[in-house]
């Protein structure tokens, strides 16, 4: 069975204008999303808090984007051994009824931690998605992602 590989890096963006200029001048970079609004709500189980462990290695999130909803669980873990690498178990699915998910969370005593709203502009360069995120009440970030590669 083939395994899906996703490589992703995020970092604070100190000069978004410079990055935008380079992407716009590059004929191979195509604008694939502009000023898309994402609303992420993060949750944690009642019996433990995902924020207690630093760096945060586990999270549960719902996302609203263009009247579409999804739910994602991620858990980062370090492999054993001398040359250990980090791996992420990620489970994500689309959701038709976000209010039903919130009600399920309420019944299971899964509590809301924080809501993060951001505006994302994305470019596709070869097999790489380069996104500029403006996070409300924070700052700008760049996300570089290679995904849907199978080995």
Task: Report residues per predicted region.
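Short glycine-rich, acidic/polar surface loops and turns
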Residues: 127-133
